[in-house]
């Protein structure tokens, strides 16, 4: 599996592609050509993208998490690679923006709010969030849309 923006140099080295969602849309022709060779496509988000693109950071509308499922069905991707379920670098109730953990990151490099987690720590186990539930709804919608496409493949 490849989850970076590297494409051409990898050639026939991998069979599952996982571009950042905007990279997939901007280079869809490349990924469709790989799909014709029997390779699979998922999408993911990590730090970016922002703006008009789908992501799951705290500052984005919750409907965007639902749209991951709808977009997956529309663009016929295999799914969404989830990162950051509970990668707390600090107490997420007190600090939603944390320094980037990479030693190569500059002193001013911070992760977007909520990038490290989509659930919260609770005294008796994890606590859900609106972002997590919105993404779940989108995943369920994806399954329903795929069933409808199989029943009516037009």
Identify the role of each PLM range.
Residues 1-6, 77, 93-154:
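Catalytic domains of carbohydrate-active enzymes that cleave complex glycans
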Residues 1-94:
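Catalytic-core regions of glycoside hydrolase
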């Amino acid at each position: 599996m490849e989850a970076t923006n590297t494409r051409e140099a990898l050639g026939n080295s991998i069979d599952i592609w996982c571009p950042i969602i905007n990279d997939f849309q901007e280079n869809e022709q490349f990924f469709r050509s790989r799909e014709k060779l029997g390779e699979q496509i998922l999408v993911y988000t990590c730090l970016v993208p922002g703006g008009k693109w789908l992501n799951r950071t705290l500052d984005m509308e919750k409907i965007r998490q639902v749209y991951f499922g709808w977009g997956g069905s529309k663009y016929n991707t295999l799914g969404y690679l989830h990162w950051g379920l509970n990668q707390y670098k600090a107490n997420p109730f007190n600090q939603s923006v944390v320094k980037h953990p990479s030693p190569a990151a500059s002193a001013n490099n911070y992760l977007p709010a909520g990038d490290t987690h989509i659930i919260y720590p609770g005294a008796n186990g994890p606590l859900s969030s609106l972002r997590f539930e919105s993404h779940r709804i989108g995943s369920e919608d994806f399954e329903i849309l795929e069933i409808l496409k199989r029943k009516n493949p037009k």
